[in-house]
Amino acid sequence: MSIPLPHAEFQWDHYDSKVNPVNGHVECTYRTLTCSWSAPRFVESPFLQVHGLAPGLNYGQQAFEGLLAHRTARNRILIFRPASHSSRFRHSASVVSMPPVPESLFLACVHMAVARNAEFVPPHNFAGNMYIRPLEFGSSAQIGLDVPDEFTFCVFVQPHVPLHGHTPLRALVAEEFDRAATRGTGNCKVGGNYGPVLKWSKDAKKPENGGWSALLHVDSKTQSYVDEFSAAALIGVKSPDQESTQVPILTVAHSEAAIHSITAESVVTIAQSFGWTVERRLVKLEELSSFSEVFAVGTAATIRPCSLIYHRSTGKHFTFTSDGPYYQRLWKTLSGIQKGEIEDIFQWCQDLRFEEFGERGHNGQPTADPTRVIEMPE
């Protein structure tokens, strides 16, 4: 059984950047009474059946992930670092009092979701990828703040195009609110960390307010250390001539109130393979002026250069080379590994288990039956 080619009727050059119809998603259910997960089931619908009093809707008991799949020139489909995303997902679930999804189940659901939607993985020569969105939430009906009787884990997928590509980021330091408390939920991937940011980022993007493309968050206690961008980690590079060293110094801004960035970890590993010096540490806001290049690093953005960070209260403008040699080398290497163009010496990519999870005879067309469910055996 061969992997389907990209959907012949899909408008790859003009598709919606928000949501596009695909074949369906994967679901499985955890029962607190038995402390066990059901087998994955493929649901040919984009919708969930959820009671309005579910804790995931009322009390924010939910966590999510984001990872990518790419099509190679030989029509293989590679999923990038799914085991690492599984580990981060388990951490996020534990923070909001949910049962962690075992790695084997997480991987099975991810592979099934991609396999059953394989024709929606963009062509190899296209700039996009398939974005994979695992989600877990408390799903049983209840009013009280008790442990739910039921949790739902699901995996959705979407063809995805980088919205900004290599366009340099212009960021504003967020000074009017704190994204995360020092000992709060900032280091896990939960919706409550992102919803409050939206009105502030929308306001910052207005032309009359400077037209900033992103917010940079700082620590809530001292307002002086970098946490992260709203949806990406911050990495800075000092060139050898700045530090009188033989190699560049790559610094990842570390914060206990920011999520562990798998993309940043990948960039660090690549930089180390180049022989560069790597640091993971607290970065003071004022230290930004010492970097020659700064990147926003995350799943959706991969690596995006930053040209300017503005600290409004002090009037400081931190400027950086926006298309520098360090960015170019790191981005080309990471992108090449993800697309199968460069040897994956780090063993990050998993080949899609299509023989195991693909469905024979599928015609590649989104179904009109939103109730059809395909069960996988226990």
Swiss-Prot record:
Residues 359-378 are annotated as: Disordered. The keyword Cytoplasm does not apply. Pyridoxal 5'-phosphate binds at R88, E228. Pfam families: Aminotran_4 (PF01063). Its EC number is 2.6.1.-. Apicidin F, like the other known apicidins, is a cyclic tetrapeptides with anti-malarial properties via histone deacetylase inhibitory activity. Its cofactor is pyridoxal 5'-phosphate. Belongs to the class-IV pyridoxal-phosphate-dependent aminotransferase family. Aminotransferase; part of the gene cluster that mediates the biosynthesis of the cyclic tetrapeptide apicidin F (APF). The non-ribosomal peptide synthetase apf1 incorporates four different amino acids to produce apicidin F: L-phenylalanine, D-pipecolic acid (D-pip), N-methoxy-L-tryptophan and L-2-aminooctanedioic acid. L-Phenylalanine is the only proteinogenic amino acid directly used by apf1. The 3 other apf1 substrates are non-proteinogenic and have to be modified by other enzymes of the cluster. This is Aminotransferase apf4. It comes from Gibberella fujikuroi (strain CBS 195.34 / IMI 58289 / NRRL A-6831) (Bakanae and foot rot disease fungus).
